[in-house]
Amino acid sequence: MRLIAAIVACALSLAAPVVSQDRLPDPVATFSILGYDPQTGEVGGAVQSRVFAVGNGVLWAEADVGIVTTQAIVDVSYGPKGLALLRAGMTPQAIVRALLDSDPDPGYRGQPWPKGGRQFAVMDAKGNYAVHTGPEATAWAGHKTGKFCTAQGNILAGEAVVNDMVAAFEATDGHLSLRLMAALDAGQKAGGDKRGMQSAAMLIVKKNGGVWLNNDTVLRLQVDEASASDPLKELRRLVEYWNTRQRPPR
């Protein structure tokens, strides 16, 4: 029991947040989907937002461990901390509680950056998941869970965004990348982020599932800036290009 407590304490001490005194960061208003394919063993996620380079801090994944998405009033350290706790054998539900309990609720230049606004989801390598939307996440904010998937978002047009994402993921056949992409498209069709579109990303992992030797990254795609057009259109082009030219590992 002491060993487990020590592992948890060590994991939660990783990547402690560094509070910038220069500016108040913008909330990562976004919608995202995490999903698992029991046939391939792949786990992955995809995200779209009206911020630059959303893929840089929202999605965190490790083969044979799981995936974490952290957004809204975001603490990026939830990503590596969540993976460390998964690696230590904790359940997604326990990890959600541990991350919130250990959050110091910091402020920026005297302004609150409340953990009540955090939104994050944790999925293990077998598709088990837990998700949290804090009461201070900017409306509309919430999540919807489904079979081997969870969709979450904030500053959205409404609840239909996450509902339609889950429905699209469950109804779509083919590789996990196509199912994640279908979910993003459905979320945008339902209204998406109320502020518009700018960037999108996708990350899928599996042990030795990538090209070349000792590569666990099946797919890592980022469209960092497309505010004048449609980041999902470009992300879909890349996903479809990969699917026509690669034979995804099984």
Identify the residue ranges that each predicted region occupies.
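Sec-dependent signal peptide recognition
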Residues: 2-7, 65
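Sec/Tat signal peptide C-region and signal peptidase I cleavage site
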Residues: 16-20
